[in-house]
From Swiss-Prot:
Reaction it catalyzes: sn-glycerol 1-phosphate + (2E,6E,10E)-geranylgeranyl diphosphate = sn-3-O-(geranylgeranyl)glycerol 1-phosphate + diphosphate
Pathway: Membrane lipid metabolism; glycerophospholipid metabolism
GO molecular function, one term: phosphoglycerol geranylgeranyltransferase activity
InterPro entries from the UniProt entry: GGGP/HepGP_synthase_I, GGGP/HepGP_synthase_sf, GGGP_HepGP_synthase, GGGP_synth
4Fe-4S listed as a keyword: no
Record: residues binding sn-glycerol 1-phosphate: Y175, L176, E177, A178, G179, S180, G181, G206, G207, G228, N229
Protein name in UniProt: Geranylgeranylglyceryl phosphate synthase
Protein family: Belongs to the GGGP/HepGP synthase family. Group II subfamily.
Source species of the chain: Metallosphaera sedula (strain ATCC 51363 / DSM 5348 / JCM 9185 / NBRC 15509 / TH2)
Amino acid sequence: MRIKGKTAKYLQKLIDEGQPIHFSLIDPDKVKDIQSLSKVASSLFKAGTSAFLIGGTLGVSKEKLDSILSVLQDFSVPKIIFPSNINLISEKADAILFMSLLNSDDLYYVIGAQVSASIIVKTIGLEPIPTGYLIVGHGGTAAHIGRARVVPYDNPELAVAYALAAEYMGMEYLYLEAGSGAPDTVRPEMVKFVSKYSEINLIVGGGIRTPERAVELVKAGAKALVTGNVIETDIERAIKIIEAMQRVYRIE
């Protein structure tokens, strides 16, 4: 049996307490000014973000990744790599979402990249968090790069089938991804349906722009939400999303 690491235990504790997890996604491609990143990260940390995800769909240099992780070391929440490929790995992070793109037609994204990365992850002592990655609806760049057969927004039954498969293969999380900057999020109805039939912990990301939609997704059964674009375009709204998620926890 695999023993959970420090980051996985931290996340599981939040879930066990009924507290929604908020991941702040930092895309190294879009960070132009390290000093500005420090201010943004400080605002997110003070608002109560649970962890930082670091990653992007397109290529990122190791040097840029390490410089961002160095800035984030000032904040006492986990720094978790959200990998687009095996180059996005660093010993400066606390953990990595060790993901399989479940609905890809390309075996590289299902298992090939994972085989290539596994020895590196082991060697540098990076904590892996087993995660199924499922692209839904719009999909965006992630769907194009990953050659995914996207799950339609209105087909929750198909999402359940993937969720059960991920659960039965021992994955701890299923990340339902609508795509960066998607015109709509994964629908709350899909989240609720998947939560009804599968016990896997659901992460939902893509297109989350308002506190109201964030609350809907949490109440539907999402254990964690990821916001990225809204952090880049409207930090005050991102903070309101975090605060709204915390109110759900306090009220319930």
